Amino acid sequence: AITNRGSQFRIPTFICGDKSDFDGRIVVLRKSNQQNNIIQFHSDIRSNKIEKLNKNSKAAMLFYDKEEKIQVRLKVECTINHENDITKESWLKTGHMSRKCYLVDNGPGTESDNPTSGLKPELDNFEFTMEQSEVGYKNFTVIQCKVKSFEWLYLAAKGHRRAKFDLENNKESWLVP
């Protein structure tokens, strides 16, 4: 799904927080490591999800493919990578258009008096070089999500099917949908 830009499983909802303050948002998966059950996406270090993950590293991810009629729910433990070998490797693979997100002066969610991209006018239309985009690296993070368990649900008119996979305890079971 990660290498297939058209896959619905490439853009899950990521949900993090605690009992009284949780939030969800769409993320774009960038890499997976099936051997270690890790998936990762990029974020801005100034995003409020980083603050939430620093308080509680446990999160959930929700995937849904309407055509396949499949829903997958993951329970994950997150690691925030910032200015380390993991972010360096990912930053080098991040394209010109994607780097633009990390060039804003103020972090995501900062209030503004007017509608804005947050970019300086000279950057708003991709009028910057890859070299100039290096300034954004200081804001770039890679969030790695270690999958602890997941549930699979297939929706069918003749009857749904549901299964749970506990990766920590190596247990699988069918569930009533």
PLM segments and residue spans:
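Short acidic, glycine-rich loop/turn motifs
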Residues: 16-20, 63-67, 154-156, 167
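Short, surface-exposed beta-edge/turn micro-motifs
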Residues: 11, 37, 56-59, 139-142, ...
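Sequence-level motif detector for i,i+2 pairs with an aromatic at +2
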Residues: 9-11, 24, 36, 69, ...
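Structured loops at beta-to-helix junctions and adjacent beta-edge loops in soluble globular domains
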Residues: 17, 44, 64, 146-148
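Charged, gly/pro-rich active-site loop segments
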Residues: 71-177
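An N-terminal domain-cap segment
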Residues: 1-36, 40, 51-52
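A short, aromatic/hydrophobic, helix- or strand-capping loop or linear motif
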Residues: 5, 10, 64-65, 103
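A short mixed-secondary-structure module that forms the rim of ligand-binding clefts
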Residues: 30-69
